[in-house]
């Protein structure tokens, strides 16, 4: 089975914008689909992760490098 994945790039955005964009994108997904969010404002990673977990989504992956972050959330 192939899981559909939508991608969202929040590079250049600072909080609360990445969380708001993530919320909107997740609302547009069907149950079981995944959203990959990438960006460069590292505090957004924890904020997005917390938002997802507090709202019943599953965080599949959360990682960061020196200058970027990536999080995959399943609806």
Curated annotation (Swiss-Prot):
PANTHER family referenced in this protein's UniProt entry, alphabetically:
SULFUR CARRIER PROTEIN MJ0990-RELATED, SULFUR CARRIER PROTEIN YEDF-RELATED
> What family is this protein classified in?
Belongs to the sulfur carrier protein TusA family.
The UniProt entry's coiled-coil ranges are: none
Organism name = Methanocaldococcus jannaschii (strain ATCC 43067 / DSM 2661 / JAL-1 / JCM 10045 / NBRC 100440)
What name does the UniProt record give this protein?
A: Putative sulfur carrier protein MJ0990
Q: Which residues form the active site?
A: 15
CDD domains from the UniProt entry? SirA_YedF_YeeD (cd00291)
